[in-house]
Amino acid sequence: RANSALPIAGRYRIIDFVLSCMANSGITNIGVATEANYSSLMDHIKSGKPWDLDRKNWGLNILPPNLEKVSYGSIKGNIDILAGISDFIHRSQQTYVILSLGNSIYNIDFEEVVKNHIESQADVTILYKDMKGMPEREISRFTTLELDKENRITDIEVQPYYPKSSMASMDVYVMEKALLESIVDECSARGDRDFVKDALVKKMTGLRIYGYEYTGYTDKIDSLKAYYRNNMNFLNSDIRRELFNSKNPIYTKTKDQSPTKYGSDASVQNSFISDGCVIEGTVINSVLSRGVKVAKGAVIKNSIIMQDSVIEEDVELSHVVFDKEVVITKGRKLIGQESYPLAISKGTKI
């Protein structure tokens, strides 16, 4: 499945964050561009009702690859994806466009971002987070930015091995629709594929590209390690309060299931337990999606267990990530590490 459709924090999907931020900011015309393996994503967002985007005009649009404009096998960069949805962009009547990855975690008011973009008279605004104090290997996962005193971007490095700056791009861009169309047309004509390297970097002297600093919690889910870490971070009450707040709520597709049942011997500590689970064993510092069954004597620590998995009696799990419908039979012991969690694919029986 697409990264943006992965379950996170038990009951949510990763894409819920960006969709909710846009909906909370009054954005009513949203297109979700897909590339491959998007059936679970389509099933999750459907008409957009949880985000109040099931509208007669505009609303939420799922945009599979346009194979008339870009052949499926030739999609090699985000310029190809944008070219494939150029009809949607052209038909949109809004002046400004916000581009964001669907696998990012944040909770931001885009109204403030657009207001700042207009006031600074920027051609392009890039959201960024100062990751000062983070290890270089973590910062190098991101595109890094150098800025002057006026917050104008003077240099861009795409995932540098030795980053010169701690200012990490969130891969969120604001610009006028007309400028985006011009960039996509020009890059497509030249055979350029990458929006940052082939468009923004090459146009830095000709465009006013500014940064907008975001000071809240953010990350992108680009690896198993990042997926595991972010799920575990949600167990931190400070991070949870920051991301899941009543002022800017995170919406998701709701499921009608019975409440979780806890047996007389069940023990749960600092965990997310979704509806429909049956807990008769021990769950510590873990995230369980809907319908997970944990039998008596089983112990789950520091793990992520997805929908409808079954953990039988006397199983011991630590630092594991299970996809949907995994079955672990009686007495098994599976131990991963925090830096290398053990991943088990959908439907596996061990």
What does each of the following model-derived ranges do?
Residues 1-233, 344-346:
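Unchanged
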Residues 178, 186-350:
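Left-handed beta-helix
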